Amino acid sequence: MEKKHVTVQIQSAPPSYIKLEANEKFVYITSTMNGLSYQIAAIVSYPEKRNSSTANKEDGKLLCKENKLALLLHGSQSHKNAIYQTLLAKRLAEFGYWVLRIDFRGQGDSSDNCDPGLGRTLAQDLEDLSTVYQTVSDRSLRVQLYKTSTISLDVVVAHSRGSLAMFKFCLKLHAAESPLPSHLINCAGRYDGRGLIERCTRLHPHWQAEGGFWANGPRNGEYKDFWIPLSETYSIAGVCVPEFATIPQTCSVMSCYGMCDHIVPISAASNYARLFEGRHSLKLIENADHNYYGIEGDPNALGLPIRRGRVNYSPLVVDLIMEYLQDT
């Protein structure tokens, strides 16, 4: 993997619009290569310290036997605290994990895209993940950021296009003979890129002739309009998903989809199940959409919380992820 100079700056306080738990810190991970620098904004959650003799499976708070990191990745026009990520970070830290949730460049509080004309391409996402991975592989960065000299990346949880980055990055790690995570959790990831092109054409009929389309998303504490160039969309649509099957068998995979997903067809769930047959766990949530909100008229049979007037299935997603990690 490419060598770059990576540094970590732990901030004394987060931006005013970000709330942290007592065990969390807001950080910038800075990468410099060939005279160019960029920053990845992240929140690190430190594990709950508990006496292992008091831990039991019933309370869902088993201490990890080794120092393990969980990395949380968001999707398109999103950020590090989106959907289930804040709650999942809390539960993972209670379980004994270090947790890092990041903003990809062009999103949240991270630096702008390297080339606005290209946008947030998948290649740029992979560069960001390479930078983040160096905080695990470099001993001095491990000590600075995670307060421990030994830690391994054990879990990656990714949503939507973040899942494609997760799987592609594992292929990159494998090619470099670097340690791979043991658990890969795909939340509503796309399987067939043609569906993305069709969706963009349906929502923005002239996007190809115009060279892209406008979207709205979180940027430095505000929702802003920004341009999505053709190259960004095609970098995702052109991914060869079947090659993910070559990820080593040591990586266990879980997929979680809302059965009323309005963005990614539910067929993606069964396609991933077949792709990773023998090491795949599939979870489907009735009445949930792409971001795990209930559809109109959802009876809320589970008594889940309501957010923005809709049933919020994120707590269930987190429960399913934690059950999977306890059982594998």
Curated annotation (Swiss-Prot):
InterPro entries: AB_hydrolase_fold, Hydrolase_4. Gene3D superfamilies: alpha/beta hydrolase (3.40.50.1820). Disruption phenotype: Cells are viable and do not display any phenotype. One of its GO terms (cellular component) is membrane. GO terms for molecular function: monoacylglycerol lipase activity. It comes from the Eukaryota. This is Putative uncharacterized protein YDL057W. It comes from Saccharomyces cerevisiae (strain ATCC 204508 / S288c) (Baker's yeast).
